[in-house]
């Protein structure tokens, strides 16, 4: 029956998958906390207009929206940044700056599915508000490098491509593109590496760009060297100065080997204003692992006073595909330390007492609740990833002991229950 299948594009998480998810999230949290970030959360359900104000047409078309029982238009969050902006705006002036927060929310987008992309995913978000210098952007890059190192990835496997929305602004200014046309052009440019050149050119022309403008955009945004960018934009380019400062600071962090300038990185969302970046597998086999950048003028789109801000979103699906490709998925056993089993049904009450005493001491114990054969119990204990099997037998218990089998070595010993 179709109603017994999960909704297309969503995932069930069985215990082994939850262990892997917990492992991944623990490294998300550790990388952020090592850099002084605090965790926050927000509702999954928001007013639809929160996302249709300034996010860009593509994300608006991907919203899961509906009308609630009171006739309000609401949406499942497609990303976390608008919710974060709402939270910051609601306490404007009361929050000490800079704000360094992170979250791991579930996000929803109705989009085409492919490897590393579903219609729901968990997204690690790390943001800094109230710091306008490029130092904050480099701090975010350092958080990413800390995470990659923790999960066993190296600069040979992952690269951080960076540019600035100011590069795009200067290029488009030079060919006379401004206003609403700017946001539409950004979306096409964000797809340059994914679309055939002829199709991208056709989309530019649909937006009213002439051949000369298209050639200028494609040439400048195809650059991979900051010196070449300086030649194209001029030595007085604000964008070039900003990116050179970013590169210098990255050297101070010791993360420059992860970084590479890529003029085509613009990010598709309309609210970015400065440095932007994406993490990619060097193999080129996967879509972007994560992406982010500076969004200094977001709050004014909600009617508030702008506050400098920068951040990134990092989905859980692509990184797991990359870790599989690199052989870095860990083998994770369950959390059970001991399995307790009464060999005689009359000893079940005593087994409950032993298990309760161990749990009170903080040990993870699985108590076999039904009458089972010892062979089944051994298989069960190994399946749980338990360290020991605690057996209650009449003879040993009369002498004040239980039998304990070390499941790694197979060695058995007798131990007093209160010494477990």
Task: List the predicted regions and their residue ranges.
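Auxiliary tRNA-acceptor-end handling modules of aminoacyl-tRNA synthetases
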Residues: 1-18
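Polyanion/phosphate-binding surface patch
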Residues: 9, 40, 44-74, 117
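Positively charged, Gly/Ser-enriched RNA/tRNA-binding surfaces
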Residues: 17-35, 46-47, 70, 81-94, ...
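Acidic, His- and aromatic-enriched active-site or binding-groove loops in soluble protein domains
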Residues: 62-70, 176-198, 281
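Short internal beta-strands
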Residues: 159-163, 339-342
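Glycine-rich, mobile lid/loop segments that gate access to catalytic sites or pores
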Residues: 162-170
């Amino acid at each position: 029956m179709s109603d017994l299948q999960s909704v297309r594009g969503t995932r069930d998480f069985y215990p082994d998958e939850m262990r892997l998810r917990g492992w991944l999230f623990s490294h998300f949290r550790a990388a952020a906390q090592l850099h002084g970030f605090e965790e926050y959360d927000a509702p999954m359900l928001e007013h639809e207009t929160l996302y249709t104000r300034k996010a860009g047409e593509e994300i608006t078309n991907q919203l899961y929206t509906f009308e609630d029982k009171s006739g309000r238009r609401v949406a499942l969050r497609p990303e976390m940044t608008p919710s974060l902006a709402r939270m910051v705006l609601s306490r404007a002036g009361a929050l000490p700056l800079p704000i360094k927060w992170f979250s791991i929310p579930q996000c929803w987008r109705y989009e085409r599915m492919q490897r590393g992309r579903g219609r729901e995913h968990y997204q690690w978000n790390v943001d800094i508000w109230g710091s306008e210098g490029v130092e904050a952007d480099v701090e975010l890059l350092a958080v990413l490098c800390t995470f990659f190192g923790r999960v066993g990835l190296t600069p040979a496997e992952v690269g951080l491509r960076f540019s600035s929305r100011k590069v795009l602004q200067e290029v488009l200014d030079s060919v006379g593109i401004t206003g609403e046309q700017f946001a539409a052009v950004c979306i096409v440019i964000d797809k340059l590496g994914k679309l055939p050149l002829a199709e991208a050119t056709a989309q530019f022309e649909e937006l009213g760009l002439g051949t000369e403008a298209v050639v200028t955009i494609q040439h400048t945004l195809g650059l991979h060297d900051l010196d070449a960018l300086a030649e194209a934009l001029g030595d007085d380019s604000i964008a070039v100065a900003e990116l050179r400062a970013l590169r210098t600071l990255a050297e101070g962090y010791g993360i420059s080997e992860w970084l590479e300038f890529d003029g085509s990185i613009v990010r598709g969302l309309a609210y970015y204003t400065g440095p932007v970046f994406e993490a990619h597998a060097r193999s080129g086999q996967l879509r972007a692992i994560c992406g982010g950048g500076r969004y200094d003028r977001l709050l004014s789109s909600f009617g508030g006073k702008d506050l400098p801000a920068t951040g990134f979103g990092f989905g859980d699906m692509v990184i797991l595909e990359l870790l599989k490709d690199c052989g870095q998925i860990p083998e994770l056993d369950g959390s059970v330390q001991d399995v307790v089993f009464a060999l005689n049904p009359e000893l079940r009450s005593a087994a409950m007492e032993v298990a309760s005493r161990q749990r009170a001491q903080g040990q993870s114990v699985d108590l076999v609740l039904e009458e089972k054969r010892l062979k089944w119990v051994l298989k069960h204990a190994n399946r749980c990833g338990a360290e020991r099997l605690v057996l209650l037998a009449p003879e040993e218990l009369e002498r004040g002991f239980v039998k304990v089998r070390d499941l790694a070595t197979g060695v058995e010993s007798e131990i007093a229950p209160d010494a477990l």
